[in-house]
Each structure stands twice: as C-alpha cells, then as structure tokens.
Amino acid sequence: MRIILLGAPGAGKGTQAKFIMEAFEIPQISTGDMLRAAVKAGSPLGVKVKDIMASGQLVSDDIIIDLVKERISKPDCANGFLFDGFPRTIPQAEALTESGVEIEHVMEIHVDDEEIVARLSGRRVHEASGRIYHVTHNPPKTEGVDDITGEPLVQRDDDQEDTVRNRLSIYHDQTEPLVEYYQKQEAENPGTVKFTRIAGVGPLAEIKDKVLSALGK
C-alpha cells in the first residue's frame, strides 16, 4: 500500500501513522529523514544535498523527487510506504505524479482548528522526564506541578496558542490545495488514487478502526 498521510499538527497523525505502518508492514518516509540519510550515506545525491544545505539554500523539488525514488526502491518498501509531510505543495505533488511514483491512497486526518488549539495549548510538560499532562484531559494531581517529583510543569513554546494558530495557518495554506489536487485526480482517474478524510476526534481505537477500514484492513 502506497499512502500519503496528511494532517495538521495536533491532529493525531503520528499516532495513526504508527498503526498504519504496523498493519501494512511498511516504512514511514519523511523528507527530513531522507535528506539526513542521504548526507550520512555519502551517495552522489547525498553529497549534492550536503553542499546545498551547507550553503543555506533550499533543496529543490527535483532533488527531493530523486531522493524519494531512490528511497522507495529499497527492499523495505516492497509492500509500499507511508509518506509523512510529503508532498507539501502542489509542485511537489505534480512532480511526484510526473515521475511515475504511483500513490494508491491519500488520507487526511481532519480535526477542527479550535479542537487542535485546545489540545495543544492545554499541554503541560515535565521537562526532566518528558511526562505530558493536559489541563483538561489529563491534569496533574496538583495544578502546575509534576505528580511524581513535585517540580513545576511548563508549556512548550510550540504549544503557545499564537504559535499553534500560526502553524495551522501554514498547514491550511499548503495542504488545502493538495486535498483539492488529489480529490480532482480521484474524480478524473477513477481507480488510480483514492482520497479519504477521516475525522480525528473520538476514542483512539475508533479512529484507528476507521483509518484501517478505509485502507482496506
């Protein structure tokens, strides 16, 4: 199964990605991981990427697509793969299509913005241990302090409401055109790529069942 998984930060995409990887025995592929691996491996493409990144430039879509094609030719992709965070833009999606990489299913884990803001801005963290609380859904026994150590909890910068809303705005700007692109592909070429939107709210097990059912498991 060759899957593209879309979802705003805080929608629970990472959790569902793990379930999909286990169910289909496929690797999760992100462009960041690919870039780092290529540089580390020292392949001709990796050397080119290293030079570009060292000069502070953005890696072009052409090189990203070459990296993708190189990565999905590896044995662990024999059963398929799960793209996470790629493609991010219409040009990347078009380049992926033109390069002959076939995608079977595009899935978006959809959660309303206000729910995501509530989820993320309510998180509190005990930095030393990594324990995570939520002011509403999983509060500490005593407000503002870790249950075990009694040390203060903090709100990460990434979880500040303004930051969350900014990240959501960027996601919508990038992803809504992608959703339309793949919906159009499905309408114009039935049987090639399927697009599904799954509501990412409710019990985790129910969301997992909806995701795997939509993918044919």
From Swiss-Prot:
Localisation per UniProt entry: Cytoplasm
Binding-site residues, ATP: 10-15, 123, 132-133, 202
PROSITE patterns linked to this entry: ADENYLATE_KINASE
Cellular component terms per the entry's GO annotation: cytoplasm
Pfam families in the record: ADK (PF00406), ADK_lid (PF05191)
Covalent S-S links between cysteines: none
Location (main, coarse): cytoplasm
UniProt pathway annotation: Purine metabolism; AMP biosynthesis via salvage pathway; AMP from ADP: step 1/1
Catalytic activity entry: AMP + ATP = 2 ADP
EC number: 2.7.4.3
Domain of life where this protein originates: Bacteria
GO biological process: AMP salvage
Region of interest called LID, as start-end residue ranges on this chain: 122-159
Record-listed AMP binding positions: 31, 36, 57-59, 85-88, 92, 156, 167
Key words, A-Z: ATP-binding, Cytoplasm, Kinase, Nucleotide biosynthesis, Nucleotide-binding, Transferase
Recorded family membership: Belongs to the adenylate kinase family.
Functional summary from the UniProt entry: Catalyzes the reversible transfer of the terminal phosphate group between ATP and AMP. Plays an important role in cellular energy homeostasis and in adenine nucleotide metabolism.
HAMAP family in the cross-refs: Adenylate_kinase_Adk
Assembly notes: Monomer.
Protein name (database record): Adenylate kinase
Organism: Teredinibacter turnerae (strain ATCC 39867 / T7901)
Taxonomic lineage of the native organism: Bacteria, Pseudomonadati, Pseudomonadota, Gammaproteobacteria, Cellvibrionales
